[in-house]
Amino acid sequence: MCMAVWYTAVGQITYPIVDTGVTEFYSNNNVISAPQSGDDFYGQDATYTGNQPLYTDNGDGTITDNVTGLLWEKDMGEKMSFEASFAKAQNSNLGGYSDWRVPTIKELYSLILFTGQVKGAKSGKLFIDTHYFNQLLGDTTIGEREIDAQTWSSTVYVGQTMNGDKTIFGVNFVDGRIKGYPKFNKRKNSENTMYFRMVRGNTDYGKNNFIDNGDGTVSDYATGLMWQKADDGKGRDWEASLAYSEHLELAGYSDWRLPNAKELQSIVDYSRSPQTTNSPAINPVFSTSEIKDPEGNSGQYPFFWTSTTHLDGVNPTSSAVYIAFGEGQGKMRNQLMDVHGAGCQRSDPKSGSKNKYPTYFGPQGDVRYVYNYVRSVRTIEM
């Protein structure tokens, strides 16, 4: 298997982040020409080019990711239960290999591309490279929506969603999101079923190697990225967050940027949550501001902006991706609860009047803060 290999000063990068694929530039409501340094909206996703997706179709039902070293199943079969996905992987000899597994949420998220676009419940352009991967939609003939096409990961949420559901994280490559999905479908009184794609290879992928540099920064030598150790305790809209990171000077470095969606998701710690560890879903080497939820309850943690626009809805350029390091809360049946799980990836409007937020949106009443927090990133020099 061919794999590109990168090194830092301390060794091989084992967790290379695949770029989002974004090449267009956006304001709060339009496609724009590429901003220059000092311009409004400079520093967004397309400003910086990372490890570009590079796949090989092996002609045997498998796809090699030449960046991550992971080997993937090309096709998706029928929807299946969480347990059935493990049985399928254990019994598979696809491509002549017998060490297939259910991917972790970080492995699975390595495949997402934010060149996709969704239109509410209808699919548009998928958030995965369809030149290599077959991605099914929800079956509208049985009452599903096209976006009901979620993919299981092996990552079990350490908390619970919906006031008691055992929850598994998954990626939706039709609408471009991570959330926690119930293991059991209460309405059908049966195990929940979702799509599934097997993986093998690079068992170090998704494992961080954090070092506290003692100067307000944290290096992850698995990804080759250096992070701002502590947020500054302030919420900002998207444009202001881009500018904050671009102008940040910290530990003698001035090349900080707002991380893209895949970079920021790489530092989520899915073994932690407010419910179970009384902490954000991030390694305690980082410092994270505690906030109150929209009802004034303490013990929550912010959503953090990324530089990535999320193309969704009638005004597709108006929202950007965030990662929830606290609970992914929503208000359902007039009750505020964790509906998506700490570590979910959703999107917020890029801008709005402060006195109108937080508010609630969509069928699960997603909390919208708009004024989200920032943790800046830079690339470690090789």
Give the positions of each predicted feature.
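Glycine-aromatic-enriched surface loops/turns that form tight recognition elements
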Residues: V10-R101, I105-W256, K262-M382
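Sec-dependent, cleavable N-terminal signal peptides
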Residues: M1-Q12
